A protein has these predicted regions:
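Conserved beta-strand positions in the central sheet of alpha/beta enzyme cores
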Residues: 88, 168-170, 242, 320
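N-terminal Sec-pathway targeting helices
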Residues: 1-28
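Substrate-binding cleft of secreted/luminal carbohydrate-active enzymes
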Residues: 28-38, 85, 246-248, 269-344
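A structural motif
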Residues: 84, 161-164, 238, 314-316
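Ser/Thr/Pro/Gly-rich low-complexity linker/stalk segments immediately outside membranes or between
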Residues: 31-54
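Glycoside hydrolase catalytic-domain groove-lining segments
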Residues: 106-111, 193, 246-287
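Chitinase-like catalytic core of GlcNAc-active glycosidases
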Residues: 47-72, 78-81, 90-235
């Protein structure tokens, strides 16, 4: 997620330069750009619409006392008529050692879960937890440490005791191939299964060109993408996976939309049929080396996801809006019109 501003600026610039390097040197000129543009051609099928499996990331204000009952009522009205089923509410972050002082950082967690269950009984409230991680971030969480993984599991169980309907992890930036990340997913998933609730993750983007994650690390010392193989390994360990398909450094809306279409196709190929797959929508505005507001639009992401989905009848596919506190009425309208409204 974009909240990790301490590391994201430099890393985003370096990975953007890696993408430019790939566009210009290892492949024939503009081959990758042309490929992305071609992914954005054609018309989405009429069947590529919401299946009632969508989600939205919610900020920390919902659990720290800043929100009121009136805000919950307004949220229910905003979500009415959409395909949103899951709310990922920021209940962390976890401490670097995996612990969570829940009473201090999320004192209104129980109030929020109770309020949502009353106002929106068909929705699930998942606790969004995570932290920056080693080796990408100094002093981050060490997921290779078994003691840290134990504390992450204990913290997750404590959060569920506050009425949450699932755990949604966002550990960043996880390098492709990380065994510690897979291990913590295995451990926490075993716990959530005993509690009868889902384990969900926010996932890195997949390599838009084979081996690009290795190139990014070689050039900058930082990774951004996951190999398709590793994405599949993660997906097999969870109940739901949401691709953070934004902050791409792409300069044009057509290239960004093609990127989302490609990401959707790649993710569909390796996500088990029983696992929910969601594609992230950039419901925020910013201009920096990793994100062009004029290019990364909700409309382009929705159209790209629909093109990537094609005529698939997969029911457990959805879109996820990031993030409620930055989303404008125009963002919500683009989601509703592009994804929720019937063609014709």
């Amino acid at each position: 997620m974009r909240r990790w501003q301490g590391w994201s600026r430099r890393r985003s610039l370096l990975t953007a330069l890696a993408l430019v390097f790939v566009l210009a040197i290892p492949l024939p000129p503009f081959v990758l750009a042309v490929s992305l543009r071609l992914h954005y051609t054609g018309e989405p099928t009429a069947e590529a619409r919401t299946r009632g499996q969508d989600a939205v990331w919610l900020g920390h204000a919902w659990v720290d006392g800043r929100k009121t009952a009136a805000d919950v009522t307004a949220l229910a009205e905003q979500l009415h008529g959409t395909g949103i089923r899951d709310l990922y509410v920021h209940a962390g972050p976890l401490e670097a050692n995996g612990s969570l002082p829940l009473a201090m950082v999320a004192p209104k967690a129980r109030w929020f879960t109770d309020a949502v269950h009353k106002a929106m009984p068909t929705l699930r409230v998942q606790a969004w937890l995570g932290n920056v991680v080693l080796p990408e971030k100094e002093h981050g969480t060490d997921l290779d440490d078994p003691a840290v993984r134990d504390r992450v599991t204990t913290s997750s169980a404590a959060v569920l005791d506050q009425g949450f309907d699932g755990i949604h992890f966002d550990f960043e930036p996880v390098r492709s191939g990380s065994k510690g990340y897979l291990a913590v997913l295995d451990q926490v998933h075993a716990m959530t299964q005993t509690r009868g609730v889902p384990l969900s993750v926010a996932a890195a983007q997949l390599d838009p060109a084979s081996g690009l994650h290795d190139l990014a690390i070689a050039l900058s010392g930082h990774g951004k993408w996951w190999s398709q193989e590793y994405f599949g390994q993660v997906a097999r360990r969870v109940d739901q996976i949401a691709v953070m398909s934004y902050d791409t450094a792409l300069p044009l809306e057509s290239l960004y939309g093609g990127f989302v279409a490609q990401q959707t196709s790649l993710a569909l190929e390796v996500t088990p049929p029983e696992v929910d797959l969601l594609m992230g929508l950039p419901a925020y505005w910013e201009n920096n080396p990793s994100h062009r507001g004029s290019a990364e639009t909700v409309a382009a992401a929705v159209r790209g996801a629909r093109l990537g989905l094609g005529d698939s009848d997969r029911r457990n596919f959805g879109l996820a809006l990031y993030v409620d506190f930055a989303a404008t009425p125009a963002h919500w309208a683009a989601y509703r019109q592009g994804w929720c409204a019937a063609d014709g």
